[in-house]
Amino acid sequence: MRTTCLFISLILIQGIKTLPILEIASNDQPQNVDSVCSGTLQKTEDVHLMGFTLSGQKVADSPLEASKRWAFRTGVPPKNVEYTEGEEAKTCYNISVTDPSGKSLLLDPPTNVRDYPKCKTIHHIQGQNPHAQGIALHLWGAFFLYDRIASTTMYRGKVFTEGNIAAMIVNKTVHKMIFSRQGQGYRHMNLTSTNKYWTSSNGTQTNDTGCFGTLHEYNSTKNQTCAPSKTPPPPPTARPEIKPTSTPTDATRLNTTNPNSDDEDLTTSGSGSGEQELYTTSDAVTKQGLSSTMPPTPSPQPGTPQQGGNNTNHSQDATTELDNTNTTAQPPTPSHNTTTISTNNTSKHNLSTLSAPPQNTTNPNTQSMATENEKTSAPPKATLPPTENPTTEKSTNNTKSPTTMEPNTTNGHFTSPSSTPNSTTQHLIYFRRKRSILWREGDMFPFLDGLINAPIDFDPVPNTKTIFDESSSSGASTEEDQHASSNISLTLSYLPHTSGNTAYSGENENDCDAELRIWSVQEDDLAAGLSWIPFFGPGIEGLYTAGLIKNQNNLVCRLRRLANQTAKSLELLLRVTTEERTFSLINRHAIDFLLTRWGGTCKVLGPDCCIGIEDLSRNISEQIDQIKKDEQKEGTGWGLGGKWWTSDWGVLTNLGILLLLSIAVLIALSCICRIFTKYIG
C-alpha cells in the first residue's frame, strides 16, 4: 500500500513540471519554471478593465521581448466566464504571436464570440516565442473581454479595427502586481507612458515565494529611458489574513478559473485600485514619487478546491462579516511554489485593523488626513433586499465607495478621490457626490463607473480655462498630473489673447460701448458735401472718419462678444449632451443586465433595440475652436504689419510712385513737343 501511494505521488509530482518557457534577461540559459499561480475568478464583480502599456516600442518584434510579455502553456484549454455587465474599453490590443516557424500560437475563436466592446486606442503587438510549445495565455487573472464572454485566450484571427475591439480585464486582486521569476537584475526600459508604472523583482530572494516579487513604484514624466534602482528590498514581512466563514455559492464555483501564467519582467503602467491597500494609500498621500516597496503576499499551504475558489472572495466576506472572522498572521512559506492570493487587505473597511510596513512610513498627520478623507468619502451602507445569490449582495456592499478611473490613453484603473486641494476641487467633489448618489441608488453595477469616466474624444484647446477637469488619482504626483492626459476635460470658459492696443476686446459683458451710432442718409450726404469746402471740409471729413472708426470698433467688439457667448453656450451644451449620452449608455447597460434572464433587450424589443448614440463631441469642439480662431483674427493699427506693398503705407507709396511717373511722362511729352516744334519751325 505504501509503495502504491509513493508511486502515485511521484507521478503527480512529475506531472507538475513543465517545459522551459521563459528566458531571464541576465542569464543566457533558459530557466525551468514549474510553479503554478493558483488564482480564481469568483464572479464578474471581481474584475474590471485595465489598460496597460508595454515597455519599449509598441510593436515587440524581438523574440525575447515577446516571450517576456506573454505566458505560454501547453495543453491548457481556454476558460470562459460569463460577463454580462459590459465595459467600454479605452486601450485595446491586436495580438499576433507565432513560433519561429511562423505558426500562430493563438487558438481559433468559438463561433459564438463576437467583437465587444468599443475601444478608443488600439495597439498592435507582434512577436515570436521560441520557447512556446502550445497555445498562448495571458497573465494569471487577466482576461480578454468579448461579447458577454471573458476569456483567458486571445483568439487567432480576431484582428479588430477602431471602435470594435476586445478589451483586457484583470482580477482586482492582482491588477497592480507584476510577476517575475528568479529575479536576476533589471533591464533598461524605454518608457512609453507618462504615468507611474510598476515593476517587480525578487531582489535578494533565492526562491520565488508565490507568483510575484517585491513591488516598486517609479515615476516617469519625460519618456526617457530609466533603469530602476538595484537596491535590494527589505525581507518580506508577515501580513494578517482574514479567513471568510461563508462557503462558495454555485455561481462562484461556476465562474471559477485557474489559468496559469509564467511572465518575467513585464512592465505595465497605470496600475492601481479603487480599494487600495494601506501602504499604497500612504505612498499616494505623500505624492513624492519615491520608491515604495510592497512585501510579497504570504503563500499559504495548498488547500482544497473549495479554498482555491474562495481566495478572491475574502474581501467581500471580510467587509460584510467583520465580526465573524478570525484574524491570523501566517508567515510566508518560501519552500512552496504555489500561492493562493488573498484580497483581505484590499478592503477599505479593514484599514483600521492593518498596519503599514516599516519601509512605507509617512507623516502621521498625512496618514490621519488620508484616513479621514477615506472615511468621509465612503457613503453609508445601504440595506439591500435579500437576493437569490448572496455572493452578489456581498460584492455590492464592497463597491459602494465612489471611485474614479485614472486617465490614460493606454490604461485605466480606479483610485480614491484626491485628498490634495486644487483649483478644481469643488467641481470634483460635486461630481463625485452626484456619482455617489447614483451608486447608493443603483448599488449593483460596479463596472458602470468606467462609463461615467468615459473620456471625451477631444483635447482641450489652447488659451482655455478648464473649470471641470477630472484628470488624476490620489496616487499621482503633482509633476505627474501635469503630463497625464485628462480623463474628463470640459472647457467651459474661453480666455482669448488680449491686446492693450484695442479699445474694445469683447471679453466681458460690459466692455463694449452701449451707444452704437447709425448714420442716416442725410448725414452721409451732408458729410460728403461739406468735404468739398476748402479748409473746412477736411475737418468735417476727419470727424466723420473718427465716428466711422468708433462705430467699426464697437461692431467688432459686439461680434467678438457674440462669438464668445456662442462658444460658451456650445461648450455648455456639449457638456450636457455628453453627460446625457453617458447616462443613456449606463441605463442601457442596466436594462440589458435586468433583462438577461429573458434573453436581453433585443430579445424583448426585437429590432427596435438597436441604438447608436453617436459621439459628436469632436465635431462640436472643432466648430468651437474655429469660432475662437476666427474671432482672434483681427487687424489693429495703421496696417504697418506684413509686406510693405500690401500695407496701407505701401498703397500710398505705390500711388506716389505712379504720380511721379505720370509727372515724368508729362515732362517728357512736353520736352518732346518743344523739340518737335523747334525742328519744324
UniProtKB/Swiss-Prot annotation:
Keywords: Cleavage on pair of basic residues, Disulfide bond, Fusion of virus membrane with host endosomal membrane, Fusion of virus membrane with host membrane, Glycoprotein, Host cell membrane, Host membrane, Host-virus interaction, Lipoprotein, Membrane, Palmitate, Signal, Transmembrane, Transmembrane helix, Viral attachment to host cell, Viral envelope protein, Viral penetration into host cytoplasm, Virion, Virus entry into host cell. Residues 277-455 are annotated as: Mucin-like region. Glycans are attached at residues 94, 171, 190, 202, 207, 219, 223, 255, 310, 313, 326, 337, 344-345, 350, 360, 397, 408, 422, 487, 564, 619. Pfam families: Ebola-like_HR1-HR2, Filo_glycop. One of its GO terms (biological process) is virion attachment to host cell. Residues 19-648 are extracellular. InterPro entries: Ebola-like_HR1-HR2, GPC_FiloV, GPC_filovir-type_extra_dom, TLV/ENV_coat_polyprotein. Residues 1-18 form the signal peptide. Coiled coil: none annotated. Changing M405L: In strain: Isolate Sanchez. Residues 670-681 are cytoplasmic. Changing A370V: In strain: Isolate Sanchez. Homotrimer; each monomer consists of a GP1 and a GP2 subunit linked by disulfide bonds. The resulting peplomers (GP1,2) protrude from the virus surface as spikes. GP1,2 interacts with human CD209 and CLEC4M (collectively referred to as DC-SIGN(R)). Asialoglycoprotein receptor (ASGP-R) may be a liver-specific receptor for GP1,2. Members of the Tyro3 receptor tyrosine kinase family may be cell entry factors interacting with GP1,2. GP1 is responsible for binding to the receptor(s) on target cells. Interacts with CD209/DC-SIGN and CLEC4M/DC-SIGNR which act as cofactors for virus entry into the host cell. Binding to CD209 and CLEC4M, which are respectively found on dendritic cells (DCs), and on endothelial cells of liver sinusoids and lymph node sinuses, facilitate infection of macrophages and endothelial cells. These interactions not only facilitate virus cell entry, but also allow capture of viral particles by DCs and subsequent transmission to susceptible cells without DCs infection (trans infection). GP2 acts as a class I viral fusion protein. Under the current model, the protein has at least 3 conformational states: pre-fusion native state, pre-hairpin intermediate state, and post-fusion hairpin state. During viral and target cell membrane fusion, the coiled coil regions (heptad repeats) assume a trimer-of-hairpins structure, positioning the fusion peptide in close proximity to the C-terminal region of the ectodomain. The formation of this structure appears to drive apposition and subsequent fusion of viral and target cell membranes. This is Envelope glycoprotein. It comes from Lake Victoria marburgvirus (strain Ozolin-75) (MARV).
